[in-house]
Every structure is written in C-alpha cells, then in structure tokens.
C-alpha cells in the first residue's frame, strides 16, 4: 500500500499505543522517523527506541512510557506540516506549544531538532509536529 504521509502514520501509531498502554509499537523505518524517535527519547516522551534491520525496509521499535494510573506521558501528538500544506517558520517565528509545556519538532537546514534548539541556534524550518 502506498502511504501518503508516513510521519502522520508514525504519530498515529504512537498515539494509539499510548492510549491503550502498549509496551511498544513498531514503525516502518526511515531516517526522518529515526530522528523524530531520537528527539522523543531525549525529551523524555518515550522510554527508548531500537532500529531493527531487515533485508527490506526495517523497522523502528518504540518503547512507550506510561504514567501512574490514567496519567499519560504523551497527551497528544499533532501533525502540523502535511504533504498537501507545508508549514514553515523563520527563526523568530517558532511557536510555543501550550505555553512551553510541549515541544515542536522542526526539520531545518541543520537537521531535525526541537523548536527550542532551533531558536537557540538561530535557524527556522518546516514544523513537522507538536507534542504535549
């Protein structure tokens, strides 16, 4: 099946896994998805991730974090820039997610990074998603 938006598929798999408290989810591998998983791990939204190599595409196994009781570590993930409507921002226009409680992930000329890192390094780019 041809997938129109693989990043939205990744975010949906993580969102659904968190909601039903799965220990892990598998996602088809790509470099961009691996970078997004690295940022989610560094920011504390997921426990870990592992790249599983195969002779075809491979996969990224994401180990999810869960809070106490009904509390979630990831409340929601929102795709911002889509294949049909790209959203870009300059270095001074990077939006804050829920007053600084969440993060946004940007694809910049210096690689994939959070909005805070992009503002600190002085680069703008395409807003991939928001996580809170």
Regions found by a protein language model. Give the residues of each.
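Core subunits and conserved enzymes of cellular information-processing
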Residues: 1-132
């Amino acid at each position: 099946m041809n997938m129109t938006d693989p990043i939205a598929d990744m975010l949906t798999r993580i969102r659904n896994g968190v909601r039903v408290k799965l220990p892990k989810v598998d996602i088809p591998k790509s470099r961009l998805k691996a970078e997004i998983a690295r940022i989610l791990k560094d920011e504390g939204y997921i426990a870990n991730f592992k790249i599983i190599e195969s002779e075809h595409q491979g996969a990224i196994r994401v180990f999810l974090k869960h809070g106490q009781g009904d509390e979630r570590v990831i409340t929601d993930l929102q795709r911002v820039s889509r294949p049909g409507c790209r959203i870009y921002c300059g270095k001074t226009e990077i939006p804050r997610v829920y007053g600084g409680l969440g993060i946004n992930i940007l694809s910049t000329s210096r690689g994939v990074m959070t909005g805070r890192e992009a503002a600190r390094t002085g680069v703008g780019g395409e807003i991939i998603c928001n996580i809170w």
